[in-house]
Amino acid sequence: MADYYLKTDNIMKNMFTVALKDELAAQSQMGEVRPATEAMLQKVRDYELSEKRLSITTEEQRELRNALNRLRDKYLAMGRYSDGIDSVILKVMKPNTSRHFFW
């Protein structure tokens, strides 16, 4: 059962995919790959944009947040702007708890 629902578009889906791939690469360098990260990456890849809402649990929210923070740190280290990542992190941190939105 999903705890939260994220209204997701193509840009967010691509950002989630890149962030989770980087997170998996960092985990493999440290020698411990968490199955939850792999499962979340597969869930994001299988997500259809026609559904409009990605259902996530608390653990999946934590995985996304950690992956996006790592991507943000990577961008800041390269001297790039992280405004888009910051806005997505806020959306992940404060997701909707209802499947039905009022807009």
Predicted features by range, described:
Residues 1-103:
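Positively charged, low-complexity terminal tracts
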